[in-house]
């Protein structure tokens, strides 16, 4: 099933301070992983792909 990344990322980023940045990275991760964890933070165990993507500095890429 196709996931609605815009909708899922709007939900995920609804409480983020850097909202635009959150949406951008969530969108990248959603397209790669076809999954966005539930809630606005945490719950990464639901989406291991999302949780394990790293940025160039080795930190978590996905919000």
UniProtKB/Swiss-Prot annotation:
InterPro entries: GASA. It comes from Juniperus ashei (Ozark white cedar). This is Cypmaclein. The keyword rRNA processing does not apply. It holds the Pfam family GASA. The keyword Nucleotide-binding does not apply. PANTHER family: EXTENSIN, PROLINE-RICH PROTEIN, GIBBERELLIN-REGULATED PROTEIN 10. Belongs to the GASA family. Keywords: Allergen. Disulfide bonds: none annotated. Expressed in pollen (at protein level).
């Amino acid at each position: 099933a196709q996931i609605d990344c815009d909708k899922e990322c709007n939900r995920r980023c609804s409480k983020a301070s850097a909202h635009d940045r959150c949406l951008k990275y969530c969108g990248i991760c959603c397209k790669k992983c076809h999954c966005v964890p539930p809630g606005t933070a945490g719950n990464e165990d639901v989406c291991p792909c999302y949780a394990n993507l790293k940025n160039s500095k080795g930190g978590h890429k996905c919000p």
